Amino acid sequence: MNHSRSHALFVQAQTRIPGGVNSPVRAFRSVGGEPFFVARADGPYLFDVDGHRYIDYVGSWGPMIVGHNHPGVREAVQVAISNGLSYGAPCAAEVTMAETIARLVPSCQMVRMVNSGTEATLSAIRLARGATGRNYIVKFEGCYHGHGDSFLVKGGSGMLTLGLPSSPGVPAELSKLTITLTYNDFDAATALFEEMGHHIAAVIVEPVIGNANCIPPRPGYLQHLRTLCTQYGVLLIFDEVMTGFRVALGGAQALYGVTPDLTTFGKIIGGGMPVGAYGGRRDLMQHIAPAGPIYQAGTLSGNPVAMAAGLAMLELIQAPDFYTHLSNAAAALCTGLQQAASQAGIAMTTQQIGGMFGLFFTDQQVETYAQATACNTDRFNRFFHAMLQRGVFFAPSAYEAGFISSAHSPNIIEATLEAARTAFQTIANEAAILSKSETPIKMR
């Protein structure tokens, strides 16, 4: 593929934008090479500035659950724009959004809109500390909750991709207030709570890890956290920025039947526009200013254009059997990829929850961060580029989940699998040639 225009833009971008991108994973540092620059998107496709089309399984990192540029969302945005871009004052759409979230996710008795997932998690942690009078928070290896200082402690996603345990600029004193546990380890959680449960303000967790690829909870694990938190007066925060309205209409908490005290949202609730939210029990949310003393504010929070896009999206995903079709499409993709890898003699495991999935180049099921990092990342990188050359775009990191949309029809899935069969066989052939070249010559 000729990517001359993308290359020129990337060179230019690096003179004005750190690393040439506005979020690290976009730079392709993990997989090698240079990123392509997008000109437009429609349905299941991205189109780059060099005229290439890609079947997209990144979906803007999750929010495009009905496909790119859906006419229902686009028209809602056009109507909202005709009435103004930002008010700095309350509008009816933000009330409707709060009511909609509360109806679909009953644990959210009250909701506060913000501008990003990071802003939502930072606000939820401040609320938890203020409401409990405690300072310690607990997170899990491989979980990513945005770029807030309290979370950049053995973080996943971009941090994992860059291979850094933390970030310069995060005070050591603050890091000491974040305790990191192994996800899916029952005994580790129990031991920590027995030792210092009464000092912990909150446990924050991705109920399905999507930032160390796609790792679901072991049976009963989320309920175990719920039980411990209740016993010790600790707030349980589900970070559903990724899983919210993605794995089920009511999010992961509905799928697994576990009720958190607070929930953070992003991505899908903005319909592709910048947005975030956090919500939870009424008695907790009443601590937020101006109802209470815990401060949080935002000039663009509840932006009318973002609210219009999000409400249109939330309306579309309530269609009958929407999630059944979404899950079936993801299952067909994962089953087909698994079969294609197996036929080529390549060890790969797929894991899928609803409309999100993960590809692990290993022959084992992956339940922990350590297992995810032990997978064959070099082989993933080869697969990524082989698929990209064939017009299929997966996340440019072995540690990011993939996403499917309602626009990914059976024909799109089959086109993906056809490309994958060729890609896997090419990788297998390359490995065989390399193996032969490395075989020592026997001297007689």
From Swiss-Prot:
Q: Which cofactor does it need?
A: pyridoxal 5'-phosphate
Q: In which pathway does it act?
A: Porphyrin-containing compound metabolism; protoporphyrin-IX biosynthesis; 5-aminolevulinate from L-glutamyl-tRNA(Glu): step 2/2
Q: Which residues carry this modification: N6-(pyridoxal phosphate)lysine?
A: 267
> Has the keyword Transport been applied to this entry?
no
Quote the subcellular location field of this record: Cytoplasm
Task: Give the GO terms filed under biological process for this record.
Answer: protoporphyrinogen IX biosynthetic process
Which Pfam families does this UniProt record tie to the protein? Aminotran_3
- Top-level class of the enzyme under EC nomenclature: isomerase
Enumerate the CDD domains for this protein: OAT_like
Q: What is its EC number?
A: 5.4.3.8
- Catalytic activity entry: (S)-4-amino-5-oxopentanoate = 5-aminolevulinate
Q: Which GO terms describe its cellular component?
A: cytoplasm
Q: Which HAMAP family match?
A: HemL_aminotrans_3 (MF_00375)
The record describes its quaternary structure and partners as:
Homodimer.
Q: Which family does it belong to?
A: Belongs to the class-III pyridoxal-phosphate-dependent aminotransferase family. HemL subfamily.
Q: Please state what the protein is called.
A: Glutamate-1-semialdehyde 2,1-aminomutase
This protein's species is: Xylella fastidiosa (strain M12)
